[in-house]
Amino acid sequence: MVSFTKFTLQLLSASAAFAYFEPLTIKGRKFFKNDTQFYIKGVAYQPAVDAEETSTIVDPLAEVNYKNCTEDAKIISNLGANVIRVYAVNASLNHDKCMEAFRNESIYVFLDLANPKTGIDRDTPTWNTDQFSSYQSVIDTFQKYNNTGAFFAGNEVVNNASNAPAVAYVRAAVRDSKNYIKSKKYRTIPVGYAGADIPVVRTELAAYLSCNATKLNNDTNSETDFLGYNMYEWCGHSDFYTSGYAARTQELENFTIPIFLSEFGCNKVTPRVFTEVQAIYSDNMTNVWSGGIVYEYSQEVNDYGLVNVSSTGERVLTTDYNNLKKQWASISPNITYKHSYNPNGTIPECPSRNKTSWAVSANAFPVTPNTTICSNAVKNLKCSANGTPSGSKISQVLSELCYYDNKACSSISSDPYEGTYGNYTGCTGVQQLSIALNAYTQDHGADSCSWGGVGELKA
């Protein structure tokens, strides 16, 4: 009898981790929980990565951090927040207990799909099978939690006009993540993008990610479900107009998807008073904006923390925390109900390309990475990569090889300005190197395979 009771309790405990919690949905430009409009009152929640190793993932939702999650969830809930944003996780770890801790405090998790190793590089952008596989792993791990509120397919990938072409890869990542969720028959989880507040490309970026490109390239389901802006324009006791909030709201007033501040909280004036909260949740902004996420929970070297976490784990609330709590407690934004809401707005036209400020076409997006296609492409090649060269070595050899014979690189080459992407641009760097080496060798003879030992002939 005792054994049965223990077993029953274990089953109840396990099922509690996945107890029903109303997921968020989108209609038009608003988030909803059940029939009631949902305004984001969020906090960025991510400890710093190792200062000496930026590829290290410190996963705040992993089971090893369960005690921290439980305490932090209560502190964040007491603040008045209903969302945390997490920038990187290790999908191979267990997250049940931490997700339950936040669910128990009615807190949703908005999660970046990328990590320091798999994010889209703004200067040398790719969207390949390794990256897509990593995104899929995060989706697989977190789709089962009903308090997984949304996924970000990228964060500040574009930060000036010169790297605007990288946004094509973001749109491809959005498309493939959404289609993967659909193909696996998971519940619909919104996939969007968090952008830097960069004046020179701000309007083009928003239009490009949300425009209906089907009529241009027949690429369906690639529109971003929402847009976030990392915006620090309001500092101290600013106001709606001086801060730039009025101008940003006007720029986005006709968009048809939810838009929110994916980061806010300027610290040029300290302690932070968060008077912008009154504007964000006021009638001036709520027709366009769905709230915002304050940067950030724990105090780090950049001095944005709401909570000081000591070396012994003690949590000490800062003046910033108390100021934000008072501001959030004082707001009462108008609520829209889903059943009676008739969305308005206009889906933007895809922005026209130009060589100076927006060198990216919407006529085509990068191909969907496909492991089978890539594996088959490198089978039985006469010349292929020798082992696993480093990323820098691959870039060096491909740069030289493609310079001497661009035809050998046609199937692995991309041109976002022209909207052209080779069939194997979604393959890994090593696979692309093998494909190019083999094509070059076919035209220039077996002696051209080596490239200093990077390539090798196969018997």
UniProtKB/Swiss-Prot annotation:
Residues engaged in binding (1,3-beta-D-glucosyl)n 2: E156, D197, R202
Cellular localization per UniProt: Endoplasmic reticulum lumen; Secreted
Main localization, broad class: endoplasmic reticulum
Molecular function terms, GO-annotated: 1,3-beta-glucanosyltransferase activity
Gene: gas2
Residues annotated as the enzyme's active site: E156 (proton donor), E263 (nucleophile)
Role description: Splits internally a 1,3-beta-glucan molecule and transfers the newly generated reducing end (the donor) to the non-reducing end of another 1,3-beta-glucan molecule (the acceptor) forming a 1,3-beta linkage, resulting in the elongation of 1,3-beta-glucan chains in the cell wall.
The name this protein goes by in its record: 1,3-beta-glucanosyltransferase gas2
Binding positions ((1,3-beta-D-glucosyl)n 1): Y87, N155, Y295
Family: Belongs to the glycosyl hydrolase 72 family.
GO biological process: (1->3)-beta-D-glucan metabolic process; fungal-type cell wall (1->3)-beta-D-glucan biosynthetic process; fungal-type cell wall organization
Statement: the UniProt record of this protein carries the keyword Membrane: no
EC number(s) given by UniProt: 2.4.1.-
Top-level enzyme category: transferase
Span of the signal peptide: 1-19
InterPro entries tied to this protein: Glucanosyltransferase, Glycoside_hydrolase_SF, X8
